[in-house]
């Protein structure tokens, strides 16, 4: 039987989110006793928990989630473990040199996930404030290699979030960014990544 590994964090009402984002709310809307069936009402932004960034997140003329070819979210992938058997310290800079030993994996169209061990901090304030961070030089190094998808176990690629996202999502590069992954240490060297988003029209 094929082994499946869930790389996503659960979504719960009231859990910590990005400081400027709306809170997650999960409410009982109908019950069996009241109307004959149970129904929950879920309210959240498109960037809660494990999620992806479409180019439209940072560019008004960029593709929205529903416009991205589905093949971008599915296919052979590789994990780059930057902290084998452990976890990186808070705010560890991830430089181009961090990825150079794995340069042969960064081929055009490749799907690359990198592990820092920071998913252990999910649910704490530090998850958002102190995560290991791509340097802009590393972001350019990755963008220059024209990979198709970049995933990570941090909530955002870099503390220089605006410029880093611009480098990775700009026209002509448009790398799908998947943030807030977990359990990357369970992945084999090569695997099939499945990360289809909800078909949400005009979503970021």
Residue ranges and their predicted role:
Residues 1-204:
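Active-/binding-site microenvironments in catalytic and ligand-binding cores
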């Amino acid at each position: 039987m094929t082994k499946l590994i869930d790389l996503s964090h659960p979504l719960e009402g009231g859990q910590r989110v990005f400081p400027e984002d709306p809170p997650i709310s999960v409410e009982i809307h109908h019950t069996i006793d009241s109307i004959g069936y149970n129904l929950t009402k879920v309210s959240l932004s498109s960037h809660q928990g494990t999620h992806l960034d479409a180019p439209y997140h940072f560019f008004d003329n960029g593709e929205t989630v529903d416009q991205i070819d589905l093949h971008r979210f599915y296919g052979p992938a590789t994990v780059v473990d930057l902290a084998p058997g452990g976890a990186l310290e808070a705010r560890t800079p991830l430089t181009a040199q961090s990825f150079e030993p794995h340069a042969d994996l960064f081929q055009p169209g490749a799907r690359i996930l990198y592990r820092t061990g920071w998913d252990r901090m999910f649910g704490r304030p530090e998850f958002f404030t102190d995560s290991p961070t791509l340097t802009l030089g590393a972001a350019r190094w990755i963008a220059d290699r024209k990979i198709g998808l970049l995933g990570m176990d941090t909530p955002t690629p870099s503390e220089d979030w605006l410029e880093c996202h611009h480098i990775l999502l700009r026209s002509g590069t448009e790398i799908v960014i998947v943030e807030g992954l977990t359990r990357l240490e369970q992945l084999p060297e090569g695997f099939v990544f499945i990360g289809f988003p909800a078909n949400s029209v005009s979503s970021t």
